[in-house]
Amino acid sequence: MYLKVNIQDYFWSSSSEVKKLKLQEDRDQKCPIFFYRWEYWFQKWLEILQPNIPPAQNYELSLRLTDDSEIQILNNKYRYQNQPTDVLAFANLEVDIPQPEVVDSDLQLYLGDIVISVETAFQQAKQQGHPLITELTWLAAHGFLHLLGWDHLDQESWQKMVKQQLFLLNAVGEVYWITDNSR
């Protein structure tokens, strides 16, 4: 089983935003995250969650790292909320649509797109008192679960999703301490 991860690094390639963020960074806030690390996280999570998705030999997803300005535009367009957010996920697999039992082994099953605002992630990491990499891992896990059909429409489903995110972070060696129960 292989997962292809397409990374669009709009945020870190934008020098003005990087300069602003680097001025605020301390030595514990190490980024950017190298491609192989993102790929490792998603591959590991896919292996853990594979029994819950249509079987395929190859999977694919896209990850876009961006700023508050771009994610606000997307949030307004797709969720009708004209404000920045931390992560958006656009699932290709719809839960209510029947999926084939087995996908042709030559084809990649496209899971969808995850968009993360690094600016918002940085602020949340500061508020939570942990490194930026931990926050980005948390948001990536959250988006990944959405791609696989998880949702949090009520408190019970929210708690289940948070528990699963914590499990996924621990599986890749990232420790996450929740200091804000509303997360």
Swiss-Prot record:
Signal peptide: none annotated. The keyword Hydrolase applies. It holds the Pfam family YbeY. Binds 1 zinc ion. GO terms for biological process: rRNA processing. GO terms for cellular component: cytoplasm. This is Endoribonuclease YbeY.
